[in-house]
Amino acid sequence: MPMSRLFKLLALAAAMIPVSALAEVTFTRDVAPILQAHCQVCHRPDNIAPMSLLTYQDARPWARSIKQQVMQRNMPPWFIDQHVGIRKFKDDPSLSEQEIATVTAWVDAGAPQGKPSDMPPPRQFEDADKWHIGKPDLIVSMPVEYTVKPASSDWWGNFIADSGLTEDRYIKAVETKPTPGGIRVVHHAVTSLVYNDRPEGGTLNEYAVGKNGDIYPEGSGKLIKAGARIRFNMHYHAIGQPITDRTSVAFVFYPKGYQPQHVINTMLSPNNDDLDIPAGADNVRSDAYFKLEKPARLTGYQPHMHNRGKAQCLEAIYPNMTVEQLSCVNRYNFGWQIAYNYADDVTPLLPAGTIIHTTTWHDNSSKNPFNPDSRNWVGFGNRTTDDMSRAWLNFYYLSDEEFKAAVEARNAKQRELSSQR
């Protein structure tokens, strides 16, 4: 047997050994690195998580809860079905099966601390960690604060702020985010460009509970022209106490003078204004369709529903009537409006005439833990107590020549990888 094959078999055998059969799993040596890589960006003081997980003393009281959350894949929040469609994404925080097994073994062993000398150096959090997209080049905030009164009804409105840009710039990433306290009362915030009092510049980004940012593939972006203003379309809801918010939008720019080859389009799938979710129904389906008139590359996808949202799948119906499942969010959680940005080497390449089909399911039964009242019929609407069945899509168009070249390059790469196996 060739030595290379022997080493591969030995490595595979080692990977199949249960964690419990190896040396005792400890916090300092085994669990802390997992928490640093996947959890501490939120689980630290003065952030959105309810507890810190920076130290053993922080984590130990929560050991059983940590085990439960990671085994159920509720934490870290990442709800894409990992057995359907495309499985490679940018900034995927989810744990591997081995990491879940490590955390589980640690808790089952009594959550031992381990040697202090095994503890990795503390993760350093800089300003870049405050934004999913990294350190921004520009941050624009609402011109004034808005305070939500304790018992007020839902409020919708617009705020417009100057960008301060004196020259045209292309952006490679954008993120909209409320203030830390505002996260509790902002149902959604949609930012868009305004030129000469006309919102002709297009949508920038959408924030909803738990939403991260949009990071565009290299060579693609959006243009912000000099003198542009930013519209903040806000939806606030009360939580029983006064909360003040001043939402901001952050940008990462390409270098001055750089013009990306492709301009990103951000669209919301068509409305299902006739959404009809009977009281107590646990699996109500709705569908939406959008046809691509030109070849395109789909770079990101984000489902959007409210409390009764259950699942959503995205598929491509090709001109030859074959169908490809692209992505499914099979455990939708209204508390985490996550944008799933495809890794560059797997972004869907869609020919002209492709129909993008979204299928959405709602659960209005008492089995849904997020359902405020299963006795009520629910229809389409902007209020939190209403619901939606929509999806945000980021894509850019390709010429016929670019599309053909991209498909050929991907096929060649797949042939190369196959020959190496």
Describe every region a protein language model picked out.
Residues 18-20:
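N-terminal signal peptide c-region/cleavage motif recognized by signal peptidases
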